[in-house]
Amino acid sequence: MLALSLAVGDILEENRVNVYYTRTEDVYESPVQKALEGNAVGADYFVSIHRNASPYSNQYTGVATYVYSLFGQAARLAESINARLEQVGFANQGINEAPQLAVLNRTQMPTVLVEVGYINTDADNELLDARFDDAARAIAEGILDIL
């Protein structure tokens, strides 16, 4: 999801938002390391972009967003991003509370983890391939909506 994250960042920067990346190359960083990097730069928000997976191919479809708590600014950000991705064509699986996730419980700012479709679902892959730019714009606009 690095390419999608970079595309989202480009759109945000075009809209005069300062963007910090935990990585710009395809190298692994642990969720804790990512959270600590976000804290170190004093980010106002932290958005972690991923693809979901299920035990069986084509079992599930759609976008899901995870937050530390269903209340507060992170939940509003998640709602905004999900709604925008739903307009692109992704099924909206909603917002999930997941305080056990390190990237959510180690950050000091409102944080969301966005799962943009299922990597093992053909329909989600086809949608993301066909509407990659729209998905990037949707995530960026979901962020801009709450700034």
Predicted feature residues:
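Active-site-proximal helix/loop segments of hydrolytic enzymes
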Residues: 2-147
